[in-house]
């Protein structure tokens, strides 16, 4: 027996039903907010992720790369390890004439995991807002993400906020090298005692500020204002990112959005430049995003600010209850026929499909529990329509009567 690749998953019919359900809710939400759908290729040049320094060396170690042979001059390509960077490249290639671009997409990303315990292929639903730099733009993306999750039936979504520039401003006072800053931040998150002791001795005011940010979880702009007041002389470099952070949470306060300020949630801040947000449902990390104002110019494009987010389909799929998809099951129609009525069965099935309803021919072994209705063609003028959910049956003479009934019309 041939096994699937380690770290990869098959999506079975029930998984795909949930996949499409989540995707449709996300897509519908995006369209109503003015976002337009795009799709980027699975393969991108490795240079897209290396030349601009958009991904850390640690992340680049996890990409799948290989030579795209063209004689001996082939370039190295990768299976995309990220959704935002290709979307930014797409904007530079094809959409620069748009001053403001709202883009959304579904994409799979690939990241190597040596253990094989984590998934190496993950599906994401992404949205990017390009050309606007304001707290209101950040709030729009956060609200869109929360709205999508609410429509999926998740009531208690935890929103955690951090700020990339604030993290960088703190770390810059400890280590000027950007790559080393990522390591130090990981050490801080892991509670490295030696590092904390060194910091307390060498930079006591910065230590107090950092300790306050790392150990406390604020829920309002006043928390950040208190941090600024307590930072003292160490707060000079922190003032600008703190003010930007305060402006962002002020907008969320006005909109009545609940959140938690958690600097530690900013892990993985590679190309972010401002507010970073993460979304949790029952403790499960289901999405996140932030502001990346320098990414597009880093890739050779215009000086355009941007922000975006992704929802993690692989994590959402097992969290969707079948009852949440009741309407999708209810709309599936099973078509049966007796005797020599195959052609009539095809006719009624096509009429049902023209109404935008799924109609499938019955074969032995089909599980009727997956369908809302069954239509049995007994003759050209005799149709038995069964509500499989309510277990009620009605006999009709005309195809039009069947269509009226399945469409919820009272004329039948």
From Swiss-Prot:
GO MF annotations in UniProt: histidine-tRNA ligase activity
CDD domains: HisRS-like_core (cd00773)
A GO CC term assigned to this protein in UniProt: cytoplasm
Pfam families xref list: tRNA-synt_His
Compartments, as annotated in UniProt: Cytoplasm
Gene Ontology BP terms: histidyl-tRNA aminoacylation; L-histidine biosynthetic process
Entries under SUPFAM superfamilies matching the protein: Class II aaRS and biotin synthetases
Pathway this chain belongs to: Amino-acid biosynthesis; L-histidine biosynthesis; L-histidine from 5-phospho-alpha-D-ribose 1-diphosphate: step 1/9
Superkingdom to which the source organism belongs: Bacteria
Keywords: Amino-acid biosynthesis, Cytoplasm, Histidine biosynthesis
Assembly and binders: Heteromultimer composed of HisG and HisZ subunits.
Family: Belongs to the class-II aminoacyl-tRNA synthetase family. HisZ subfamily.
Function field: Required for the first step of histidine biosynthesis. May allow the feedback regulation of ATP phosphoribosyltransferase activity by histidine.
UniProt cross-references to PANTHER family, sorted A to Z: HISTIDINE--TRNA LIGASE, MITOCHONDRIAL-RELATED, HISTIDYL-TRNA SYNTHETASE
Other notes: This function is generally fulfilled by the C-terminal part of HisG, which is missing in some bacteria such as this one.
Descriptive protein name: ATP phosphoribosyltransferase regulatory subunit
Native species: Dehalococcoides mccartyi (strain ATCC BAA-2100 / JCM 16839 / KCTC 5957 / BAV1)
Gene assigned in the entry: hisZ
């Amino acid at each position: 027996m041939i096994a699937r690749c380690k770290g990869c998953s098959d999506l079975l019919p029930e998984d795909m039903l949930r996949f499409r359900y989540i995707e449709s809710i996300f897509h519908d939400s995006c369209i109503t907010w003015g976002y337009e759908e795009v799709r980027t290729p699975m393969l991108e040049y490795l240079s897209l992720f290396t030349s601009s320094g958009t991904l850390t060396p640690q992340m680049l170690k996890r990409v799948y790369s290989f030579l795209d042979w063209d004689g001996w001059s082939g370039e190295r390509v990768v299976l995309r390890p990220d959704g935002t960077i290709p979307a930014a490249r797409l904007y530079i290639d094809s959409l620069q004439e748009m001053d403001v671009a709202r883009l959304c997409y579904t994409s799979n990303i690939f990241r190597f995991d040596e253990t094989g315990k984590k998934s190496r292929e993950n599906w994401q639903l992404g949205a990017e807002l390009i050309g606007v730099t304001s707290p209101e733009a950040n709030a729009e993306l956060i609200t869109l993400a929360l709205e999508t999750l609410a429509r999926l039936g998740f009531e208690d979504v935890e929103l955690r906020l951090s700020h990339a520039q604030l993290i960088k401003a703190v770390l810059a006072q400890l280590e000027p090298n950007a790559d080393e800053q990522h390591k130090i931040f990981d050490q801080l998150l892991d509670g490295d005692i030696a590092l904390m002791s060194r910091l307390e001795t060498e930079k006591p005011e910065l230590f107090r500020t950092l300790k306050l940010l790392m150990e406390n979880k604020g829920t309002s702009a006043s928390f950040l204002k208190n941090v600024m007041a307590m930072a003292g002389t160490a707060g000079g470099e922190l003032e600008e990112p703190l003010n930007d952070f305060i402006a962002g949470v002020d907008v969320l306060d006005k909109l009545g959005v609940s959140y938690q300020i958690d600097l530690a949630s900013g892990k993985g801040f590679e190309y972010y430049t401002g507010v970073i947000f993460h979304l949790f449902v029952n403790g499960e990390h289901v999405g996140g995003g932030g502001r990346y104002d320098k990414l597009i110019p880093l890739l050779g494009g215009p000086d355009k600010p941007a922000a975006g987010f992704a929802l993690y389909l692989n994590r959402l799929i097992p969290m969707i209850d079948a009852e949440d998809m009741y309407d999708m099951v209810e709309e599936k129609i099973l078509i049966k026929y007796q005797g020599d009525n195959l052609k009539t069965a095809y006719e009624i099935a096509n009429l049902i499909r023209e109404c935008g309803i799924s109609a499938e021919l019955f074969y032995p072994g089909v599980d009727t529990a997956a369908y809302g209705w069954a239509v049995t063609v007994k003759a050209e003028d005799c149709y038995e329509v069964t509500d499989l959910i309510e277990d009620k049956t009605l006999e009709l003479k005309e195809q039009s009567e069947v269509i009226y009934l399945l469409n919820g019309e009272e004329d039948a």
